[in-house]
């Protein structure tokens, strides 16, 4: 490693070269997160419910977390989305149109004790799921 008066170019070249050893730099520079993301970098996406499923919570918790398999309209990809709220799954039927968003876990990953689920349902048939669960609104027919 040069330390002289004229070593700046070599130092800069080395920094540029060794940045590619940093996984976060590579993912950010090549835009890999957006390429792998089913939502394609968007904050929300529309989809059609394919089926309702129950997912077992991770240790030390013991529960069946209610979720749905959703096929996204924009690209046809299938994702699993969590249904937040007490009895929320009862307001969602197959073939309903839902809007999903990221669930908000660390580093864009899953959250809490729900393994492998990175998305949550926000709206059902253009009605807020939270309002449906609280009983303020009724689900509209599509």
Curated annotation (Swiss-Prot):
GO molecular function: rRNA binding; structural constituent of ribosome
Keywords annotated in UniProt: Ribonucleoprotein, Ribosomal protein, RNA-binding, rRNA-binding
Example GO BP: translation
SUPFAM superfamilies cross-referenced by the UniProt entry: Nucleic acid-binding proteins (SSF50249)
Gene3D superfamilies, per the entry: Nucleic acid-binding proteins (2.40.50.140)
UniProt xrefs under InterPro entries: NA-bd_OB-fold, Ribosomal_uS12, Ribosomal_uS12_arc, Ribosomal_uS12_euk/arc
GO cellular component term, pick one: small ribosomal subunit
Record-stated family: Belongs to the universal ribosomal protein uS12 family.
PANTHER family, alphabetized: 30S RIBOSOMAL PROTEIN S12 FAMILY MEMBER
Function field: With S4 and S5 plays an important role in translational accuracy. Located at the interface of the 30S and 50S subunits.
Subunit field text: Part of the 30S ribosomal subunit.
Name of protein: Small ribosomal subunit protein uS12
Taxonomic lineage from the root: Archaea, Methanobacteriati, Methanobacteriota, Archaeoglobi, Archaeoglobales
